[in-house]
A protein has these predicted regions:
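Residue patterns forming the tRNA-binding/recognition surfaces of aminoacyl-tRNA synthetases
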Residues: 1-129, 133, 147, 217, ...
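Short hydrophobic/aromatic-rich motifs at helix boundaries and adjacent loops
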Residues: 72-75, 193-195, 245-247, 329-333
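Intrinsic disorder/low-complexity signature
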Residues: 19, 322, 328, 340-343
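Short, glycine/acidic-rich hinge or "gate" loops at secondary-structure transitions
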Residues: 113, 237, 314-336
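Alpha-helical recognition segments enriched in aromatics with Gly/Pro capping
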Residues: 1-4, 109-111, 119-121, 129-287
């Protein structure tokens, strides 16, 4: 059942938590002479990411969006935006769209936005409500202002097929459906603005997220936009890689397998961390194993030489001003004269700056 306990039809173990039943099941098999083999096997197993308690996969009734019907439209719309780097669009995301399956958008939990579907007990009559106004008209309730489930689950819709009343299904939306609906929800479209106003800011000029969002936000944005508007939801997209712990595993607050960002900032400065990330595989949508020593080396190999060069410049400006009795002022004409200089060091400096350009 929903609590992980065996149902009454499993008479020998009814009401027992599935993990607590393991040793009893083994003993029952042994006592009945039906045990073929018993031992310990090491294998992957699902655990709750919060409580770390063992999980059991169980088939439940869910609601799906038939993504397979619009797969070709998804592939076509994927060709329009500009992706940086481009290989994510051409390989990873395209492959994900090519193998797209129907999307299970419902979740069996309490917290979440309620799916606005009312159905008869036999599921043969279904109504999907499109607005508060429509819900008021269908239910006859005029004081609907809050759409959280505790405020609408009691509302019923009279059946048009003689099936009594329709009740809201118990499921709520997958949070990724909500993320993919962001372009419309942020402006309360189509209720607060019309099509013309909406299209002034759609598709988005630019979005950015991590590589893992090819299966998350990028995907749900594209599916909903293709279904609702027939086009891609963005014009330009920048993808960054994933920053991992030093040992190559996912960063985890519970495992504390990464240095505190505030410690890094306080010890080495925010700019050192920024430059470390800017000069890493992350900007090429590749993974980075974050190392504190990497940030430290940026300070030692880049920022300290920069600071020493700056200090050398300031010291010589101060000496120049003291010797000449006037302020040092940048003179663009001096650059032109340096280009014609016969001094080898001057010519090297000009050459180095041209290489930078």
């Amino acid at each position: 059942d929903d609590d992980g306990k065996f149902l009454p039809k499993i008479s020998d173990f009814q009401g027992m938590y599935f993990k607590d039943a393991d040793p009893i099941i083994i003993k029952t098999l042994k006592d009945s002479g039906r045990m073929v083999a018993s031992g310990t096997v090491t294998h992957s197993y699902p655990f709750c990411w919060r409580s770390q308690s063992p999980l059991m996969y169980r088939a439940v009734d869910t609601w799906f969006i038939k993504v397979t019907d619009i797969k070709q439209d998804l592939l076509k719309n994927n060709e329009d935006p500009r992706w940086v780097p481009s290989f994510v669009q051409e390989k990873r995301f395209k492959n994900w769209l090519t193998d797209a399956r129907d999307w299970c958008f419902s979740r069996n939990r309490y917290w979440g936005n309620p799916i606005p579907i009312w159905a008869s007990d036999d599921m043969e009559e279904i109504v999907c409500v499109g607005s508060i106004k429509e819900l008021q008209e269908l239910t006859g309730s005029k004081d609907i202002t809050d759409l959280h489930r505790e405020n609408i689950d009691h509302l019923t819709i009279p059946s048009k097929k003689g099936k009594g009343v329709l009740r809201r299904i118990p499921e709520v939306f997958d949070c990724w459906f909500e993320s993919g609906s962001m372009p419309y929800a942020q402006s309360h479209y189509p209720f607060s603005i019309n099509d013309e106003q909406f299209m002034k800011g759609f598709p988005a000029n630019f979005i950015a997220e991590g590589l893992d969002q090819t299966r998350g936000w990028f995907y749900t944005l594209m599916v909903i936009s293709t279904a609702v508007k027939g086009c891609a939801p963005f014009k330009n997209l920048i993808v960054n890689g994933i920053v991992l712990a030093e040992d190559g595993t996912k960063m985890s607050k519970s495992k504390k397998n990464y240095p505190d960002p505030l410690y890094i900032t306080k010890s080495y400065g925010a700019d050192a961390c920024r430059l470390y990330l800017c000069n890493s595989p992350v900007v090429r949508a590749e993974s980075l194993q974050f190392k504190e020593t990497g940030v430290k080396s940026v300070v030692r190999e880049i920022f300290l030489p920069w600071f020493n060069a700056y200090r050398f410049l300031i010291q010589n400006i101060s000496r120049y001003e003291a010797q000449n009795g006037k302020n040092f002022v940048y003179d663009p004409s001096m650059v032109a004269s340096l280009n014609e200089s016969s001094n080898l060091m001057d010519r090297w400096i000009i050459s180095a700056t041209q290489n930078l350009i």
